[in-house]
């Protein structure tokens, strides 16, 4: 494999992990903050808020996992080699 292609693949993998976890991380923080605020305002809706929060956190975490998969493909099953 060409050294330039290898370096570009490693850099792309690093960007995929970094940027792929930045957005969901911020989103998860905002979602958790909104859930805590909702619980403080309406404690009787705890079950409904918790269920919605867990589902939305799972969807956000899936985006991070997609970034990890892209990075692993670039590192170990390089399509450009």
UniProtKB/Swiss-Prot annotation:
F(1)F(0) ATP synthase produces ATP from ADP in the presence of a proton or sodium gradient. F-type ATPases consist of two structural domains, F(1) containing the extramembraneous catalytic core and F(0) containing the membrane proton channel, linked together by a central stalk and a peripheral stalk. During catalysis, ATP synthesis in the catalytic domain of F(1) is coupled via a rotary mechanism of the central stalk subunits to proton translocation. Key component of the F(0) channel; it plays a direct role in translocation across the membrane. A homomeric c-ring of between 10-14 subunits forms the central stalk rotor element with the F(1) delta and epsilon subunits. It comes from the Bacteria. One of its GO terms (molecular function) is lipid binding. Pfam families: ATP-synt_C. Its main location: membrane. It comes from Synechococcus sp. (strain JA-2-3B'a(2-13)) (Cyanobacteria bacterium Yellowstone B-Prime). SUPFAM superfamilies: F1F0 ATP synthase subunit C. This is ATP synthase subunit c. The gene is atpE. The keyword Ion transport applies.
């Amino acid at each position: 494999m060409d050294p330039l292609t290898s370096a570009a693949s490693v850099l792309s993998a690093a960007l995929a992990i970094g940027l792929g976890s930045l957005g969901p991380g911020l989103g998860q923080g905002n979602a958790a903050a909104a859930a805590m605020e909702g619980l403080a305002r309406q404690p009787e809706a705890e079950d409904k808020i918790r269920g919605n929060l867990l589902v939305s956190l799972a969807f956000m975490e899936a985006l991070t996992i997609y970034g990890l998969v892209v990075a692993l493909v670039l590192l170990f099953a390089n399509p450009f080699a």
